[in-house]
């Protein structure tokens, strides 16, 4: 076995040890370990299961804490074990043992990289599920088809991540695509991953709806906001709400309810409107719409605070949800994020949900 390769492995383990120490401090390892012990104790209380919602929250918190604490524990023990295995492999000239060490160290590096990525999730709601509102801009069929393409892109991204998606509201376009839609994305750090997708998305392409095959520009807006659990208090005055019911519509007229089960809620002080029609029960749709409203009010408050903070920092641009964030030029095979400068040429892969590069660039640059 070459001494250079052995030294390289030992250097990798030393580097992992240093990075592990840094991330333990940054992520408050001891605090999270203590809290995990508390949460495990709570989960073992039989009384907890009398409150299914609370039990679900405890289970979710436990999973997030375990993802940090147990990973750091595994990295620490892995570093120590592999140092001993390297010594044994050298003494016994064990090529197979040495190959196993290289594979295991590569796995430790992957775990560390995943943890370091999670360091970028610095907002309280980052671990939460989220909602995505997609709305077609002006331009009729072109814009509605583009909104439908974005709807598919985010659905495919969620599937790639192993997330669960639920369509809460969908208003089909007259010819193609959608006029607007709201989807719920359920999964660990769904909001943290998707929050930087908020903004206006611009499409440039030769239109399939134009017999002259002219180049068209279309716009659609995306708004991502977190699902709020009971740990974050949002007070809503019932007097501030206007609640309307209407008949739910389905794609192509399918499964249309004959009762007014769909619910639209308007929060009059802010003008925020939410609607839900995915359930046949008006009561269930109203409950879902209220959860969406709480989440939107939370996101509005967070954005107000961020804007106030940015106003104090010279040179910071407005990153309100109305800002154009990304350009998709299909005939040139180019998709570029206007905030980070990140650019790719494989437009098909991106529209099929391969958003990791864009999301990572946005989080790294603190967008």
From Swiss-Prot:
The modification N5-methylglutamine is found at residue 254. Methylated by PrmC. Methylation increases the termination efficiency of RF2. One of its GO terms (cellular component) is cytoplasm. It comes from the Bacteria. Coiled coil: none annotated. One of its GO terms (molecular function) is translation release factor activity, codon specific. The keyword Cytoplasm applies. Its main location: cytoplasm. Belongs to the prokaryotic/mitochondrial release factor family. Peptide chain release factor 2 directs the termination of translation in response to the peptide chain termination codons UGA and UAA. This is Peptide chain release factor 2. It comes from Neisseria gonorrhoeae (strain ATCC 700825 / FA 1090).
């Amino acid at each position: 076995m070459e001494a250079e390769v052995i030294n390289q492995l030992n250097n990798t383990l030393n580097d992992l040890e240093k990075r592990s120490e840094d991330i333990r401090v940054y992520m408050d390892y001891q605090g999270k370990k203590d809290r995990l012990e508390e949460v495990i104790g709570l989960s073992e209380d039989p009384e907890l299961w009398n409150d299914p919602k609370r039990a679900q929250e405890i289970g979710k918190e436990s999973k997030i804490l375990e993802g940090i604490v147990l990973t750091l524990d595994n990295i620490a023990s892995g570093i120590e074990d592999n140092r001993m295995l390297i010594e044994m492999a050298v003494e016994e000239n064990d090529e197979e043992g040495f190959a196993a060490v290289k594979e295991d160290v590569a796995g430790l590096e992957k775990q560390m990289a995943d943890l370091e990525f999670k360091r970028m999730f610095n907002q309280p709601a980052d671990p939460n599920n989220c909602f995505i509102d997609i709305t077609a801009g002006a331009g009729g069929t072109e814009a509605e088809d583009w909104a439908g393409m974005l709807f598919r892109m985010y659905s495919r991204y969620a599937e790639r991540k192993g997330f669960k998606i639920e369509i809460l509201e969908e208003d089909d376009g007259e010819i193609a695509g959608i006029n607007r839609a709201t989807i719920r994305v359920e999964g660990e750090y769904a909001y943290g991953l998707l929050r930087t997708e908020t903004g206006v998305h611009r499409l440039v392409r030769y239109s399939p709806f134009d017999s002259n095959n002219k180049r068209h520009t279309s716009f659609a807006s995306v708004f991502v906001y977190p699902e709020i659990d009971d740990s974050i208090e949002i007070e809503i005055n019932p007097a501030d709400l206007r609640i309307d019911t209407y008949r739910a519509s389905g794609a192509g007229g399918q499964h249309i309810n004959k009762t007014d089960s769909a619910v639209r809620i308007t929060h009059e002080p802010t003008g925020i409107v939410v609607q839900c029609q995915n359930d046949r029960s008006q009561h269930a749709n109203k409950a879902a719409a209220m959860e969406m409203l709480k989440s939107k009010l939370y996101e509005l408050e967070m954005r107000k605070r961020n804007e106030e903070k940015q106003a104090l920092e010279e040179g910071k641009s407005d990153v309100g949800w109305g800002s154009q964030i990304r350009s998709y030029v299909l005939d040139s095979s180019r998709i570029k994020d206007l905030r980070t400068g990140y650019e790719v040429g494989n437009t098909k892969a991106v529209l099929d949900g391969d958003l990791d590069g864009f999301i990572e660039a946005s989080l790294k640059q603190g967008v």
